[in-house]
A protein has these predicted regions:
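N-terminal amphipathic/basic-hydrophobic helices that include classical n-h-c signal peptides
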Residues: 1-11
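Contiguous segments within soluble domain cores/interaction surfaces
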Residues: 10-122, 130-135, 139-147
Length: 147
């Protein structure tokens, strides 16, 4: 089941249209099917379990879904950040550049699926952490996960 992210809007700098993060799914692996270009998500999860800390979180993937982008764009810069919400400490940050076809005109009803590979990072204590999604450095969505 896809867990719905908190929906936060930000005005797209190019066209003054609100972009929405409609979902963030965490999983162990993402495979893109060659023939259909569809994604297969392997072993989806919502939290990490540990018997002790500090915990070295092994690598995993995040699939981000962005919608309500209207107009023409060369690229859309999307970032995924993992942080401790109380302190703002960032454990992981990655930026993806979504390149669109030259003739593509987004109507706003399309869902852009952006996979992110998340490399290992260390968590020193149990708690609730956040996956934050940004477009052009403006937050558009987030979801919690427990360690």
């Amino acid at each position: 089941m896809i867990r719905q992210a908190d929906i936060i809007t930000v005005l797209m700098s190019n066209n003054l249209e609100p972009a929405l993060c409609s979902g963030i799914v965490l999983c162990e692996k993402i495979i893109r099917e060659a023939g259909t270009n569809k994604f297969t998500l392997i072993n989806c999860f919502n939290n990490f379990n540990s018997k002790g800390f500090p915990l070295m979180v092994r690598g995993f993937y995040g699939l981000v879904m962005v919608t309500n982008c209207k107009g023409t764009f060369d690229t859309i810069n999307v970032a995924l950040r993992i942080e401790q919400p109380q302190t703002g400490h960032v454990f992981f940050n990655s930026v993806g550049h979504v390149k669109l076809r030259e003739d593509a005109v987004l109507q706003g009803n399309e869902v852009l699926e952006i996979p992110f590979q998340i490399t290992p990072f260390q968590v020193s204590e149990p708690g609730v952490y956040s996956v934050v999604i940004l477009i052009d450095n403006d937050p558009i969505g987030k979801r919690a996960f427990t360690v």
